[in-house]
Amino acid sequence: MSNKRIEQSEIEKYWEIFASLSNGGTHLTGAQAAPVLKNSQLRDEQLERIWDLADVDNDGNLDFEEFCVAMRLIFDLVNGEYADVPPALPDWLVPESKAHLVQANRALTGRQVQFERVEDDDDTPGLKDGFDWYMSPSDKSKYEEIYSANRDGRGDITFESLDTLYSSLEVPDTDIRSAWNLINPSAAPAISKDATLAFLHILNNRHEGYRIPRTIPPSLRASFEKNQIDYQVDNQRIASPAQKWGVTGGEETSTGRKAKFGETYMSRLGIGGKSSYRPAGTDFSGTKTTEDWEEVRLKKQLAELEAKLEKVESASAARSGGRRDTKPALVKRELEQLLDYKRRELRDLESGEGKSKIGASLKGVADEIATVKEQVDALEAHLRTREQVLEGLQQEIENEKSSR
């Protein structure tokens, strides 16, 4: 039996949304609920099916319980819990007050709940767990070069545009398509720069022997699923299955001698190293990533520093008279280097120099300046706290030395 349920914190959040939309009423019409539902960026036909599932009593409106059901279905779809809208409402999502209606409907239609099909790749031999969304600067630079060499006139990437890259990797076709579907749940014919970087990062890790993740962190998904107006009429036409789901007419990716991700491919294009290759057109690859990506990287760096400081504190607390190697100066220097890097980013953004000089809109630069300022303030406060901790530890060490 599934242990899934809607948590109390979710219910309280949904109630705030419901109350603001219903203006004190007990039900929401389609017009009232539409703005919130469409913010999910799901396709209209998916939202229609979600509405039909959530409207258990079939009155054409959603009461609060039904609204909670609809919001949870949307949340799970956006976060990759479902590949598509389920054909029937899962038992754990059926409101208790309406369970009899669902049972009666199933009895009349003869429709039974189907088991959800989960693609499990745990039986693939030799693959490792522990996929990490953090992109090192060298990896990110490599991804951006591949993106710049293959983007179209609108700055997007299609699945077919990277065929040559696929053939240079030791990654099965099924995994390549799984990665594409993961970062492109709306089955769009092309993806944006941020989504492309995430796609290449997944392929890189799979090439290195890590399993493809099943979900994308919400903060990362939001960074490449922002609502953007598409002025191209041809993009509104129905895309082929190959464009939507990364199916290339039955072709299989060939594999060869394993090399570092993208090296063979970039060598063919003349990218990287001392090559003079420059992609045609305006290069927006220098535009800084969103604060969501930066937040992930910064949190990882801070977690590593926290772990080092924790080791220092543990060694001091459990000292037994032996020689300790706490290296507080090294930890302090790493924190200072991280702060210096953020300050340089802030100066570049304010002066319009460096990477922010190309392709960044005024609004985007202002947002990034505010984000970096907040990060610098937080890091400075964090550094001051840790400096005090280090000073205390150093004082304890000196006291112990003097007492011997």
Swiss-Prot record:
Q: Does the keyword Repeat apply?
A: yes
Q: Give the UniProt keywords, A-Z.
A: Actin-binding, Calcium, Cell membrane, Coiled coil, Cytoplasm, Cytoskeleton, Endocytosis, Endosome, Membrane, Metal-binding, Repeat
SMART domains attached to this UniProt entry: EFh, EH
PROSITE patterns from the UniProt entry: EF_HAND_1, EF_HAND_2, EH
Location within or outside the cell: Cell membrane; Endosome membrane; Cytoplasm, Cytoskeleton, Actin patch
Q: Which residues form a coiled coil?
A: 290-403
One GO MF term on file is: calcium ion binding
Keyword Membrane among record annotations: yes
One of the GO BP terms on file = endosomal transport
The record's section on Pfam families has: EH (PF12763), End3 (PF12761)
Domain (EH) ranges: 10-100, 139-227
**Function description:** Component of the PAN1 actin cytoskeleton-regulatory complex required for the internalization of endosomes during actin-coupled endocytosis. The complex links the site of endocytosis to the cell membrane-associated actin cytoskeleton. Mediates uptake of external molecules and vacuolar degradation of plasma membrane proteins. Plays a role in the proper organization of the cell membrane-associated actin cytoskeleton and promotes its destabilization.
Assembly and partners are described as: Component of the PAN1 actin cytoskeleton-regulatory complex.
Name of the protein: Actin cytoskeleton-regulatory complex protein end3
Species of origin reads: Botryotinia fuckeliana (strain B05.10)
